[in-house]
């Protein structure tokens, strides 16, 4: 016998354009964890404060956040499974408007005579606001295609299956280096780069950097450094609604 499903409408209600929800999912879900040790990290957190909706995905090593302005003031904090969100955006058309209802247990997505309901993830989502840098000691504006291509070319050079890249940045040159005792090394200079601030040298996960650049989907990327071994901010200089944060890794040399 097919089980009874409770489709009682939750009390919190807000409306999103389908294109906005698609942007939220494409720019945050990739950063969610794919491991079940901390279930709350496998979902996208929707945190509404007033009429601002902050959507965040993190696996504790990186953060992706998208901010959307709502038509009405709301106050809720829920975490929706990233897989459920992916299924929703596959089902909607760009022209759709989505009514979203939520409480502490479930969320409903209502559009075009369709209801998609999902359970929420229990647990407290981490306070990601505290890792977002509020200032920087240096920054660089780079061509997205050049830096993505440079990182992608070195993807086969790995340490313990992790693709590490070292950024050596100055006002003279910006190098992207990789090294593996078993495979070899590479060193490329970015030719389309505008750099400001003090010199800095940091190692980070190249796969995470590439994911962030691809998710931003812009021609130029702004990379801001807040200091040695401090979080790296990656953003679209023409769109303040989305940002990516990467946690540096202890250097291999």
Model-predicted segments: where are they?
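Structural preference for solvent-exposed beta-strand-turn elements
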Residues: 1-253
């Amino acid at each position: 016998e097919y089980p009874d499903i409770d489709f009682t409408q939750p009390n919190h209600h807000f409306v999103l354009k389908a294109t906005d929800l698609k942007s939220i999912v494409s720019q945050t879900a990739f950063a969610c964890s794919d491991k079940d040790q901390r279930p709350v990290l496998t979902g996208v957190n929707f945190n509404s404060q007033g009429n601002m909706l902050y959507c965040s995905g993190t696996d504790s090593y990186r953060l992706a956040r998208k901010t959307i302005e709502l038509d009405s003031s709301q106050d809720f904090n829920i975490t929706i499974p990233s897989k459920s969100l992916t299924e929703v955006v596959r089902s909607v058309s760009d022209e759709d408007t989505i009514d979203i209802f939520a409480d502490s247990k479930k969320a409903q997505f209502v559009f075009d005579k369709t209801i998609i309901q999902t359970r929420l993830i229990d647990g407290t989502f981490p306070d990601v606001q505290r890792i977002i840098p509020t200032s920087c000691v240096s920054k660089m504006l780079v061509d997205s295609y050049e830096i993505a291509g440079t990182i992608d070319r070195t993807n086969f050079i790995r340490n313990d299956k992790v693709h590490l890249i070292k950024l050596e940045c100055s006002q003279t040159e910006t190098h992207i280096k990789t090294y593996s005792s078993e495979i070899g090394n590479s060193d490329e200079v970015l030719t389309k780069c505008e750099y400001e601030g003090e010199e800095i040298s940091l190692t980070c996960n190249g796969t995470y950097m590439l994911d962030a650049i691809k998710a931003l989907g812009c021609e130029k990327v702004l990379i801001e450094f807040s200091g040695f071994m401090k979080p790296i901010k990656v953003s679209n200089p023409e769109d303040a609604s989305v940002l990516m944060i990467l946690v540096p890794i202890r250097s291999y040399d």
